[in-house]
C-alpha cells in the first residue's frame, strides 16, 4: 500500500513563493508509483491540499486530514518546505508531534 505524503509549503513570510517552488520541485522528483503525493499550501489560516486535478480542498486541522472524492485521507508523513513561520520555528513540528505524524524539514 502506498504511503500518503504531504509536501507542506507556503508560510507567513515573504519567502512564500520560494517555498511553493521548492514544494513543486520535490513533487516532481518523488516517485509517484511508490507514494501518494500532495502539496499542502499554508498561508495564515488557509491550509489547503492541492488535488491532482488542480483544485484545492481544506485541511481538517483536528487530525491533518482532508476529503477527496468523498473519502477521508490521512497523511503518513509530512515534508516541511516552509521558510520562516510556522515551518522554521517549531510550530508545525510541535503540531505534527502531537498528532503522531512523522516529518522532515
Protein language model features and the residues they cover:
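ATP-binding N-terminal substructure of ATP-dependent carboxylate-amine bond-forming enzymes
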Residues: 1-105
